[in-house]
């Protein structure tokens, strides 16, 4: 008699076969095997692993359509297995799938916006997770791209220096300084915003708050002296740097020292 057990492979064998195929780049074959496992052994201990492996296989393929499918699969995983530790990994990968599809600052912003939302969700939902530092760094990179896109438009209007153009610049710059405080040109954005507001009698009373923010939040900025001079000219008290800004500067100095130490050790 034939060995019937061979015609109905147990879930473990199916899973291991699929993983082997995926590791060898046979993504479609691996996914078919995993789907067979999911459909056949609905109470299997490998069910969650199989769902996640399908999502990972699409992510690893890396094409536009595959990354789109990966997002759908990771979201499906989270729906069914939100209670598992791997749900945080799935959330991170959703953000990364959008991150990998991001365009340059002056191109379509759809994927960058989606990546920003997913990484923000990760930071809020998993504040103690081991992937938090990576998620925060990716979020900062995404926001740099979004802010840079807005800044280029704002600068275009700012340099036109007409009333209508200044109004358009003010709208863009206001969003940058409120939404993206870690943007590499946040201090310059504050300066441009204060300058644009100061040139209109109806808005000049708003300008000091933005010059003050340069002094408070970006004490090492090249715009600090000019911002202080503007505040004095407007008879507004010059504030001190905020404790948060000083703490951030200290952290950055320590990180730079660590990087320098690593370079020195690498060079011998």
Question: How does the language model describe each region?
Answer:
Residues 1-268:
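Acidic, polar-rich low-complexity tracts and alpha-helical solenoid repeat scaffolds
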């Amino acid at each position: 008699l034939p060995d019937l057990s061979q015609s109905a492979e147990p879930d473990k064998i199916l899973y291991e076969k699929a993983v082997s195929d995926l590791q060898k780049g046979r993504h479609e074959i691996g996914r078919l095997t995993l789907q067979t496992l999911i459909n056949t052994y609905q109470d299997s201990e490998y069910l969650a692993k199989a769902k996640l492996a399908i999502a990972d296989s699409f992510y690893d393929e890396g094409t536009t359509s595959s990354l789109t499918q990966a997002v759908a699969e990771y979201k499906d995983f989270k729906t069914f297995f939100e209670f598992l530790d791997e749900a945080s990994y799935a959330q991170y990968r959703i953000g990364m799938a959008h991150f990998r599809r991001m365009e340059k600052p002056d191109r379509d912003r759809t994927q960058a916006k989606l990546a920003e939302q997913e990484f923000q969700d990760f930071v809020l939902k998993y504040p103690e997770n081991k992937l938090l530092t990576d998620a925060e760094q990716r979020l900062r990179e995404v926001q740099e791209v979004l802010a840079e896109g807005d800044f280029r438009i704002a600068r275009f209007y700012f340099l036109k220096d007409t009333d209508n153009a200044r109004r358009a610049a003010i709208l863009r710059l206001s969003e940058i300084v409120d939404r993206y405080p870690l943007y590499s040109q946040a201090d310059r954005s504050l300066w441009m915003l204060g300058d644009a507001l100061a040139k209109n009698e109806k808005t000049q009373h708003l300008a000091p708050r933005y010059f003050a923010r340069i002094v408070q939040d970006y004490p090492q900025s090249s715009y600090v002296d000019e911002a202080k001079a503007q505040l004095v000219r407007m008879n507004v008290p010059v504030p001190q740097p905020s404790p948060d800004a000083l703490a951030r500067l200290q952290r950055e100095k320590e990180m730079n020292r660590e990087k320098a130490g690593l370079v020195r050790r690498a060079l011998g």
